[in-house]
Amino acid sequence: MRVRKRQSRRTSTKLKEGIKKKASAHRKKEKKMAKKDVTWRSRSKKDPGIPSNFPYKAKILEEIEAKKMKDLEERELAKQQRLEARKAAKEQGVDAMDEDMIEDDENGLAALVESAQQAAAEYEGTPSNDADVRDDELDVIDYNIDFYGEDVEGESELEKSRKAYDKIFKSVIDASDVILYVLDARDPESTRSRKVEEAVLQSQGKRLILILNKVDLIPPHVLEQWLNYLKSSFPTIPLRASSGAVNGTSFNRKLSQTTTASALLESLKTYSNNSNLKRSIVVGVIGYPNVGKSSVINALLARRGGQSKACPVGNEAGVTTSLREIKIDNKLKILDSPGICFPSENKKRSKVEHEAELALLNALPAKHIVDPYPAVLMLVKRLAKSDEMTESFKKLYEIPPIPANDADTFTKHFLIHVARKRGRLGKGGIPNLASAGLSVLNDWRDGKILGWVLPNTSAAASQQDKQNLSTINTGTKQAPIAANESTIVSEWSKEFDLDGLFSSLDKAIDASKDQDTMME
């Protein structure tokens, strides 16, 4: 049998080009017809809806309808408030737009005024009235001291911080005349260590002031409770070291960065002028990592809204790695220090619980958090204690109805929801709960999640505070302190002239409470 030769598939160029032209003309015609078609086609996928056999369908539909009605009421209420505010401003002769922009442009306008004053002084050849040094002439000294020693393989970040505690803290205490202990306003008690207070009281001639930072993240009534609680032990000053919360919800707007930082700086200068020292006093700043120590120093260095950044800052713990001394003027120096995880006073807590609490205090960088789930679970339990925090939390993450009887089950379903919404998925579309947990902790660190802790005003807690302040554990016996806490607060307040500052801050807090009440 003769095998036939395979027929060639070669075609002429004329035939090939003809096919191409016909195909192109066909596609062009189809595209033109599609444009003329009036039928609307959405590119987004259609919502499949709720299955009819789903047992909670009726309940979910009711909740969706209730949410729509609630959102509509909120929009109408906000519109009515805007109209009333515009009407009131018009009656007073003030433009509503200008009234809203006053606070936002406060720092920028102050900086422009100061720049104009300095330029005029240079042009006229007259010296400036400000005795302080300029921002670009700040005298900054870095002390490169090895606080952590040699790296040990397998040593955790918490163990390194414990090792550096004695060296860093002792260096700051010995070099400082005044200690600014920075606390996180959302949870001051957890960022506070009684051993630090005892060590300062044991050092003769040292003064301790509690700085309640991040006051823009808590409501005025919570701030007022914490101030009353902390003022019974030491002088406490609220401070807003950063420009504002990134979540758009900011409390205590009357306590601006310029107002609080200027008041604190004036108090330090008053103490410096009243002290009989022939040298400049040194103000040491201590606290947990990421509570805002460097931001406090930068706020103090700001000249009427200036943008001095003598200390590097960041939203993650561990930015400051060495002692840094900044000279403000001839009578005042500030000493910045790395964050310290102070030794825990509760020995009954497990290592996992302690690390979860540190993660919730933003004291651990994200790369050192092994398992974020315990910290997220602790956060969920904290937010569940208040309806205001719970509603804000659900609104932020758009949490659907989750059938859960306990916090553990709810947290797992919540992390699955966050992982799917933010694309934190692993192989095969499996939700990555660890990545979702870190994302939630980052939102908490950045202030996107509204949350706070109320002070424990029980009799047992008050008695424990008095006992801690009235005695110092020296290792062998209890050494009494000469003055009680009320005497300490009154005497130190006079030295820093804090009475006028406290009265002005109380008025600002009351004004913030009235403003929040009107917005509600």
UniProtKB/Swiss-Prot annotation:
Subcellular location: Nucleus
UniProt-annotated binding residues for GTP: 213-216, 287-294, 336-339
Region called Disordered, residue ranges: 1-53
Annotated Basic and acidic residues bias: 35-48
Residue ranges occupied by any CP-type G domain in the UniProt entry: 165-343
UniProt key word GTP-binding: yes
GO process annotations (BP): maturation of LSU-rRNA from tricistronic rRNA transcript (SSU-rRNA, 5.8S rRNA, LSU-rRNA); protein transport; ribosomal large subunit export from nucleus
Sites bearing Phosphoserine, chain numbering: S337
CDD domains per UniProt: Nucleostemin_like
InterPro entries assigned to the protein according to its UniProt record, in alphabetical order: G_CP_dom, Gnl3_N_dom, GTP-bd, GTP-bd_ortho_bundle_sf, P-loop_NTPase, TRAFAC_YlqF/YawG_RiboMat
Sequence ranges of Basic residues compositional bias: 1-13, 21-34
GO CC terms in record: nucleolus; nucleus; preribosome, large subunit precursor
GO MF entries: GTP binding; GTPase activity; mRNA binding; RNA binding
Keywords: GTP-binding, Nucleotide-binding, Nucleus, Phosphoprotein, Protein transport, Ribosome biogenesis, Transport
Gene3D superfamilies tied to this protein: 1.10.1580.10, P-loop containing nucleotide triphosphate hydrolases (3.40.50.300)
Protein task: GTPase required for 60S ribosomal subunit export to the cytoplasm.
Domain notes: In contrast to other GTP-binding proteins, this family is characterized by a circular permutation of the GTPase motifs described by a G4-G1-G3 pattern.
Family: Belongs to the TRAFAC class YlqF/YawG GTPase family.
Other comments on record: Present with 7130 molecules/cell in log phase SD medium.
Protein name: Nuclear GTP-binding protein NUG1
Gene this chain is encoded by: NUG1
